[in-house]
């Protein structure tokens, strides 16, 4: 069923490592080779896509963008003939090495001037034969989009409608042109099942990488990512349609399904930097870390400060580089440990809690706040009895913030398409302010169920506001009237123009506003029997500034 990607290129690099006492280690270096690179010549160390994103958003290029020093890496490999470089992180100035040396940490610490920190992050229980045939590929064909604005979501109708993202779809924002990367534990059979067939045919699966076992295809095993991806990308009209079916996708395996070690956080960091190199707009993952197979490692509540976990640190750096990062809040809400995990507690990450399709909090959805008192979760979407696509080609129900997070990420992708010039922080801020509990956040769902039509309107608002507006709802249901309040500091004359798009006839009305709050009511025509819904464009002018809003009517 999968369309072959004939333009993909494959990298084949095979090394054979016969392990005696193998382990993997994270080393954070104490300095970078500042003579090797120059901020004035970013082409030497940043991809064209990364440079373009920085130019677009006015993001400065800094020494943080410089690669890890090759000289330092060579020193490590020269100290230990069994040492093999696995991955690097330029943002955190560190690297992961494989070694068979029986006392690798002591060996490296003897050269302490080179490093700030070293720890063992993975232990192999038995000697292993590593055959690293890299299955990384990229699709060079031009992506196409053949998806209408008016969608039949099938079983997934309510899980889409509860966040009002269907209104963004109706406005034409389904994620087209937005690149979204998923970091997960494998996407078994995703290249074969019906839910994603359209994406392969339209060349919107742009790249795939397995960081954990580079020799294995991400489609080979590990079914968690398959269900996660379907929440965003499923396109089976009448059966299941995801929250952003028109996105371009990168699929990256960071999770080792065999074990739970700290190295998975480092894999996650590598995946973020990979996304940066590709110019990715949004990264989502349904992963979290508090406990590990090595019980000497433990993320206690005091670790939920955004400054402890390497993954959490990297998440905030990614946002500073122009990306938006979304993560599941976690599924510990009904357990002794009921808090969110890392990296969901990162300052600028959007941590997503779970609800059912009528708005009840899922009992398993993890609680905030962070250790330093910040509100979490940042929003909520359906993750309880969620309809998802599975590796056996069936559409079934599943539970977990693993599903609410990608559902949410797809909705954010629709906003990103609608506002390509807004910064990541501006979009994150609008999303948080659009939560039902924003005025009175709690520890259960944080800012609450997010209204993405409200977020859209918040991003429409001008910065130079003489007037402030309060809409109880941006969707008019069962009545023919628009109602909202306008607050002004002084008496002001305004003109309001509004229209139903299907009718195309503009109505106008003048108001003399008094200082303080003013109630506004505008009549709108009934929908014809042929129309299930319509969009209302609202333009308010005070003679100095125009204020634009978009409402839905059904």
Task: Describe the residue ranges of each PLM region.
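Primarily auto-inhibitory N-terminal propeptides
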Residues: 20-80, 95, 102-106, 114-129
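Autoinhibitory propeptides
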Residues: 73-159, 166-169
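C-terminal subdomain of the subtilisin-like protease fold in secreted/lumenal serine endopeptidases
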Residues: 157, 280-284, 417-491, 496-502, ...
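Subtilisin-like serine protease catalytic core
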Residues: 166-209, 214-264, 278-281, 294, ...
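Catalytic-core environment of secreted peptidases
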Residues: 192-203, 354-402
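Hydrolase catalytic cores
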Residues: 229, 252-256, 281, 339, ...
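Substrate-binding/access-modulating region of protease and related hydrolase catalytic domains
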Residues: 235, 251-345, 371-374, 391-405
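Edge beta-strands of extracellular beta-sandwich domains
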Residues: 509, 544-554
């Amino acid at each position: 069923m999968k369309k072959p990607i004939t333009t993909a290129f494959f990298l084949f690099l095979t090394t054979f490592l016969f392990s005696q006492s193998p382990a993997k280690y994270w080393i954070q270096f104490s300095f970078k080779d500042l003579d090797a690179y120059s901020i004035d010549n970013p082409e030497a160390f940043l991809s064209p896509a990364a440079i373009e994103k920085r130019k677009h958003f006015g993001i400065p290029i800094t020494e943080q963008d410089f690669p890890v020093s090759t000289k330092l890496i060579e020193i490590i490999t020269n100290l230990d003939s069994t040492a093999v470089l696995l991955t690097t992180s330029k943002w955190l100035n560190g690297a992961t090495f494989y070694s068979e040396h029986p006392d690798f940490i002591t060996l490296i610490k003897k050269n302490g001037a080179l490093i700030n920190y070293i720890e063992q992050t993975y232990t192999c229980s038995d000697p292993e034969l590593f055959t690293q045939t890299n299955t990384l590929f990229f699709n060079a064909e031009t992506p196409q989009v053949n998806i209408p604005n008016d969608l039949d979501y099938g079983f997934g109708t309510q899980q889409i409608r509860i966040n009002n993202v269907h209104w963004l779809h109706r406005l034409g924002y389904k994620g087209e042109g937005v690149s979204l990367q998923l970091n997960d534990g494998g996407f078994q059979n995703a290249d074969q099942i019906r839910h994603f067939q359209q994406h392969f045919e339209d060349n919107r699966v742009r790249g795939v990488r397995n960081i954990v076992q580079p020799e294995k295809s991400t489609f080979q095993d590990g079914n968690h990512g398959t269900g996660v991806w379907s929440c965003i990308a499923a396109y089976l009209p009448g059966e299941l349609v995801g929250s952003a079916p028109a996105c371009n996708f990168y699929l990256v395996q960071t999770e080792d399904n065999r074990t739970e070690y700290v190295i998975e956080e480092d894999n996650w960091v590598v995946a973020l930097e990979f996304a940066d190199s590709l110019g990715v707009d949004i990264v989502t993952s349904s992963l979290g870390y508090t406990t590990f197979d090595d019980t000497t490692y433990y993320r206690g509540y005091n670790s939920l400060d955004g400054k402890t976990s390497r993954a959490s640190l990297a998440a905030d750096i990614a946002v500073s580089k122009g990306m938006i990062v979304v993560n599941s809040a976690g599924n510990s809400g009904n357990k002794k440990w009921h808090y969110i995990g890392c990296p969901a507690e990162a300052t600028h990450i959007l941590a997503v809690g779970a609800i059912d399709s009528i708005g009840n909090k899922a009992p398993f959805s993890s609680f905030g706040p962070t250790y330093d008192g910040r509100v979490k979760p940042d929003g909520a979407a359906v993750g309880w009895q969620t309809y998802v696509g599975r590796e056996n080609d069936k559409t079934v129900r599943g539970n977990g913030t693993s599903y609410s997070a990608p559902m949410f990420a797809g909705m954010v992708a629709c906003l990103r398409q609608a506002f390509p010039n807004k910064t990541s922080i501006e979009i994150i801020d609008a999303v948080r302010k659009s939560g039902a509990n924003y005025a009175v956040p709690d520890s259960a769902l944080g800012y609450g169920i997010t209204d993405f039509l409200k977020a859209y309107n918040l991003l429409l608002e001008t910065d130079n506001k003489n007037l402030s507006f309060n809409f109880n709802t941006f969707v008019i249901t069962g009545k023919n009237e628009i109602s909202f309040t306008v607050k002004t500091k002084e008496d002001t004359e305004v003109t309001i123009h509004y229209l139903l798009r299907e009718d195309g006839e503009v109505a106008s009305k003048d108001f003399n506003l008094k200082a303080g709050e003013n109630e506004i009511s505008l009549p709108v025509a009934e929908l014809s029997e042929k129309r299930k819904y319509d969009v209302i464009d609202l333009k308010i002018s005070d003679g100095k500034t125009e204020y634009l809003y978009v409402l839905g009517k059904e």
